Amino acid sequence: MKNKLNVSFVLGIRNAERTLRECLNGILMQNYPKEMYEIIIVDGNSTDSTLSIIDEYMNFNKNLILMHNPKKLSEGRGMSKDLGIKAAKGKFVVLLDHDNIILGKDWLNQMLSPFNDKSIMASQSLLDYTKGDSNFIKYVNTLGVEDPFATPYSLVAQVVLHPNKFRIINDYYIHELNPRHVLFGGANGCVFRKEVFEDINGYTRDVDVFASMADLRMKVAVPLNPRVYHKTSSDLFNFMKKKGIYFYRFIKNDYKIKKYNWVERRASDKLRFLLLVLSSLSILPSLITSLNQVFKTGKFFWLLHPFYVFYISLEYIIISLFNIKNFLHYYLR
């Protein structure tokens, strides 16, 4: 950009000792004047060495700000990310999680480049893996979405799988969000104009933010080159365990307070959701997708895709059956 504008990195964290150093190092190595950005960390009452790590970095970085959230949660109105965004002074807000590691020194400049177009309201990063990663980690980072069941709803995953469906301007894809079929983003390195959160009345959750942006038909860029590494669970078992816990919390209570409903009120949306479940269990559609990616990229880790989609879908179905009343309320409302 011709004029470097103020940027606020916002991290909502709790017990982040495993990856926090790598996350902060990725931010601090950017080819961007340190006086032109701030790092706001909102801690949710960490009980490990997270706070001592933050203190260590604050001794050498005056642009690092620590806030506290006694309610512990990072997402939701009045929670860590929302508090950090409200305190942000930058014209642009970068949302990162503590296990997001920026790859390359020019990531921030490349992510800001699309904002030369005044109609672009957010810039979503693609993901990549690092040398020595397991095939599972390579797959998750290349697909760009933690939950493969949500692939049809993920902006990053759709760009990866179907790039020809998106228009390219200069060095980024451009997508106008559509309330009839929201492709969501917002996690793993997403940059927003600060005014977005003013227009949608604050931050709640990544998916809800994009749903609110879609109501206003906002445009999102996906730059071709910059990448973030999501240092997530190292194996399939731990990952399935984590996703199961998240989904259990969702169907038990969280669905009641989310703006975005995966199963919208229209009959066509409910039918599309059922077809998605059936196709996920049949394996064939996701197998075709994985084979296409193997032939296109030569990366054999794509062969994990149909099996992971099947197992995660089966896990969600089992959890839903044990909470059938809540699921029916969610599906039929």
Question: Model-derived features: where do they sit?
Answer:
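Glycine-rich, basic loop-to-helix element that forms the pyrophosphate-binding segment
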Residues: 70-88, 110
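Short, flexible, basic/aromatic active-site loop/helix in glycosyltransferases
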Residues: 143-182
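Short aromatic/hydrophobic "clamp" motif used to bind/position activated sugar donors
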Residues: 93
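Non-catalytic, C-terminal membrane-associated alpha-helical segments of glycosyltransferases
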Residues: 244-248, 262-333
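N-proximal low-complexity "stem/linker" segments adjacent to membrane-targeting elements
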Residues: 1-29
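A short, conserved alpha-helix in the catalytic core of glycosyltransferases
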Residues: 184-185, 189-190, 196, 201-226, ...
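Conserved donor NDP-sugar-binding/catalytic core segment of glycosyltransferases
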Residues: 106-155
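A conserved acidic beta->alpha catalytic loop
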Residues: 43-52, 97-101
